[in-house]
Amino acid sequence: MGSFKGHALPGSFFFAMGFWWTMKNILKSVYKRQTRTCYLNSKTLLRRTEIWEGVVVLLMSLTGIAGEQFISGGPALILHKDGQWNQILGWHHTTMYLFFGLQGITQIICFTTNVLPLSSSKLMLSIAIFVETFMFYNHTHGREMIDIFVHQLLVFVGTFSGLVAFLEFLVKNNALLELLRCSLLMFQGTWFWQMAFVLYPPCGSATWNLSDIQNKMFLSMCFCWHYASILILIGVKYALANWLVKSRLRKGCTSEVGLLKHADREQESEEEV
């Protein structure tokens, strides 16, 4: 992960999954508020969606593991070499991907068999996030100030995300907790991208002074801006989903009224005959 791509890849994974889960939870919530029957709550559709989510998470994790181990001179699954640990930071990242892969497998098992309770996938998600946080907490020894600081902020978001995911495991079907967890996952995703630009600026970009206190102050403010942007994005998505559902229900009601009028006319014509 010691490169721009190495930070952009997990950032894209976190943001994509958080974005999808946000849309799914918003649509479920809006449908529940607008109508008693919700197609999104169909057991068959729900199971299929959860299974495919597990498959996608597993594929993302395998992609991350392959990238860490075999691309750009990775350790290639060799942990100890020439009397010392072989690229131990790469193994940290592999461990993080491993636990998210286990979460994907758990979700697939939960929704394809009756071996595990459905809430096990939420518990495994919480564990995976805590493992990610633990890895990054022990990731920055001996580095420069800004490098340590941006990782500390990631650990802060990860710890909060893990706690919310665990609360979601304890408190079933809480829409606010679900949205909070999704927003924090998206937050981790955007912050991974910010770390990529700070620590490994692309060619042609200005290099950050990693020992400048003013850069630290700016990144503190930038950190808050990231989450503000995510909250605004969620608000826009909620308003859009609410408008789409209302317009769809309005069309449904109009078509039902049209069918009733057509039936009344047919009945009147039959009576005249």
Curated annotation (Swiss-Prot):
Topology versus the membrane, per the UniProt entry? Answer: Multi-pass membrane protein
Q: What is this protein called?
A: Transmembrane protein 45A
* This protein's UniProt keywords: Membrane, Transmembrane, Transmembrane helix
- Please give the superkingdom of this protein's source: Eukaryota
Q: Which residues cross the membrane?
A: 8-27, 55-79, 108-131, 153-171, 217-236
Q: Where in the cell is it found?
A: Membrane
Q: Which gene encodes it?
A: Tmem45a
Q: What is its main location?
A: membrane
Q: Cellular component terms, GO, for this chain's entry?
A: plasma membrane
In the record, the note on similarity to other proteins reads: Belongs to the TMEM45 family.
The cross-references to InterPro entries, in alphabetical order and at most eight, read: DUF716, TMEM45
> What organism is recorded for this protein?
Mus musculus
The disulfide bonds in this chain are: none
